[in-house]
Amino acid sequence: MFARLVPRLQPQLLSKRVLTARYPMLTTTPIYHQTPMQIIKRNYVIVHRERKKEPVIRYLFYMLVASWVAIYFVANRVDKKKPPQQSFTEREFQSYEEETGLKRRNKLISHTMNSKYKFYVIPYVHDEEELKKVANLLQHKDENATVKIIDPAQLIEEQKKDEGMKYHYLLEDLDEQGRPYPPGLITAVIKQEIYKILNTREGTFDTNFIIKNYPQTTNEAIKFENDISDIQKCLILHYDMLNELPKNKTNEEQRAIKNVDGYFNSVGKSKTLVEKFDPMDKEFEEIMLEDI
């Protein structure tokens, strides 16, 4: 019987020997036959347990919703605490013009029309009698042209009173909010008035325009020459600038108006009229000779 079992057990015994020879770790060695390193390896085997997979997508979704809610409430609080805007930038004014169809196009009066329409600006004038005297002297020196005085302050008031005017609602909003007029707004109102004049019978004549109390910033001066026409002369009334300007304007406004004089003086377009010491009539004689 034992002889019969030997052939059957021989392959199993042989395979066991081969495995033992190839992989000695598979055999069980008594502890008293093991080396210290084998004992340490046996006691410090790391067993990797399967971790439960957390719902990552659901977690991220909740975090995203929570962040949106937090941003919403923070933004609302910031808007409520944000102080009212105290200025109206040129970019905001341009956006307003684009939205309302009032965007500026090319220069209103081309260079070929400069001999027909001339513009004289007075950055600051306090005495209306002096303004009339300037207009009369200009009319006397250039009898072939009419003289038209433009008062930007009066044009602004007309815009406020008439709801049909282009800038009525903008001016109304700015006044209600106590915000200053944006750079370019006064120039835009003046441009509208000049455009209206040019499209009437009055616009068919050669005209010398006098714009009072304008420009009072170099920004407005540049915009006028970019959007409307070249400025012939900037007339500085010496007495009003010296005596009346400090009484009626803040230091910042005075500085801005004086900068206008400096700007036109740098390009040779500024003329100071000193009536008491140098007759104004003589000054206009020089202006007319320069224009010819």
From Swiss-Prot:
InterPro entries: P-loop_NTPase. Residues 1-26 form a transit peptide. Its main location: mitochondrion. Gene3D superfamilies: P-loop containing nucleotide triphosphate hydrolases. It is found in: Mitochondrion membrane. GO terms for cellular component: mitochondrial membrane. This is Altered inheritance of mitochondria protein 36, mitochondrial. It comes from Candida albicans (strain WO-1). The gene is AIM36.
